[in-house]
């Protein structure tokens, strides 16, 4: 069994990766099982080279982590705590952060998806809607009347 696999990014760049690193992705693991020992490059059509390298960096750091136990991992989902290495890893611009989240979702890397989503949750935590809009450059498309109506309908949530 080959110890490395070749992944082809959406922009056509081949990256050679240790098999155990690549198999942090459920999608790639399943593709490798289907392909057998063909040695063919695995196309990753939704992820460009820069993002794929970043994902590989994360997978390399976490290659010895125990596999995710899936949805029954409630304690993991109820907290927004992120370990120090992952916090530093996620200190990227917003576009890259969202690209990493999309790639983790596409590649089925639950732990990386969790870290990305927790990073976004921490960016939102404790902020007003106006501050959140500013953080993510979101245009407010409600009229003042609509905002008042929404506030009245949701008064109970602010108690």
From Swiss-Prot:
GO terms for cellular component: CBF3 complex; kinetochore; nuclear SCF ubiquitin ligase complex; RAVE complex; single-stranded DNA-dependent ATP-dependent DNA helicase complex. Residues 101-159 are annotated as: Interaction with the F-box domain of F-box proteins. Pathway: Protein modification; protein ubiquitination. InterPro entries: SKP1 (IPR016897), SKP1-like (IPR001232), SKP1-like_dim_sf (IPR036296), SKP1/BTB/POZ_sf (IPR011333), Skp1_comp_dimer (IPR016072), Skp1_comp_POZ (IPR016073). It comes from the Eukaryota. This is E3 ubiquitin ligase complex SCF subunit sconC. Essential component of the SCF (SKP1-CUL1-F-box protein) E3 ubiquitin ligase complexes, which mediate the ubiquitination and subsequent proteasomal degradation of target proteins. Controls sulfur metabolite repression, probably by mediating the inactivation or degradation of the metR transcription factor. Pfam families: Skp1 (PF01466), Skp1_POZ (PF03931). GO terms for biological process: exit from mitosis; G1/S transition of mitotic cell cycle; G2/M transition of mitotic cell cycle; kinetochore assembly; mitotic nuclear membrane biogenesis; negative regulation of cytoplasmic translation; negative regulation of mitotic metaphase/anaphase transition; positive regulation of D-glucose transmembrane transport. Keywords: Ubl conjugation pathway. The gene is sconC. Belongs to the SKP1 family. Component of the SCF (SKP1-CUL1-F-box protein) E3 ubiquitin ligase complexes. One of its GO terms (molecular function) is ubiquitin protein ligase activity.
């Amino acid at each position: 069994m080959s110890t490395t696999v070749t992944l082809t990014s959406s922009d056509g760049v081949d990256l050679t990766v240790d098999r155990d690193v690549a198999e942090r992705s459920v999608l790639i693991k399943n593709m490798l099982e289907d392909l057998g020992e063909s040695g063919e490059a695995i196309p990753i059509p939704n992820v460009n080279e820069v993002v794929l390298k970043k994902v590989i960096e994360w997978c390399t750091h976490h290659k010895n982590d125990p596999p995710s136990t899936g949805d029954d991992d409630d304690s993991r989902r109820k907290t927004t705590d992120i370990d120090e290495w992952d916090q530093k890893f996620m200190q990227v611009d917003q576009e890259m952060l969202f690209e990493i989240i999309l790639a983790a979702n596409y590649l089925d890397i639950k732990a990386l998806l969790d870290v990305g989503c927790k990073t976004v949750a921490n960016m939102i935590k404790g902020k007003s809607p106006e501050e959140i809009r500013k953080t993510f450059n979101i245009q407010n498309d409600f009229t003042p009347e609509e905002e008042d109506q929404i506030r009245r309908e949701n008064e109970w949530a602010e108690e």
